[in-house]
Amino acid sequence: MHVSIIDTSILCNVINIPNMNQNHKKVMEELVALQQNKLQTLILPLATIIETGNHIAHIADGNMRRARALVMAELIQRTVNDQAPWTYYGKEFEREELLEISKEVVDHAVREIGIGDLSIIQVYKTYKETVPAIGSIRIWSLDSHLQAYFEEMPAIRRRRDR
């Protein structure tokens, strides 16, 4: 199984948000390719939904804002009803995970990396630690600081394979 955690930069291109959709065609082509790969699992974190919704709320043109909000509403409904190409990851953070995020807030803020991105990074870490049999995992993002989150996971060897 190969896991891609969807970042806000990707969802903004999927929804085609003005001024945040420079890679719309490329993202849509990759999304189609990922959907066709039966070994691929797409994960949509709550932070990605919230950040994307905030970007939609700040679209200057009211008609465009409404149009993109309608697309977002449909996307959320399809996600909840298991009709989207990804799986919703809405697990709330445990106390320890929030403490880990709190330790990184200042250093990341200095580098202009917000809590939304830290939350997505935490989803990456948690998913990697709790879901067995992952071949690879990455944060699917257009942001270079998040693209660095990619790992090939070592195969778990069964006793009879030794």
Residue spans of the language-model regions?
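Short, well-structured N-terminal submotif of metal-dependent ribonuclease cores
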Residues: M1-L44, H55-V71, E152-D161
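Acidic, glycine-rich loop-and-strand cores that form catalytic or ligand-binding grooves
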Residues: L70-T79
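Active-site neighborhoods of divalent-metal-dependent phosphate/nucleic-acid chemistry enzymes
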Residues: N81-H145
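C-terminal/domain-terminus segments
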Residues: I134-G135, I139-S141, L146-R162
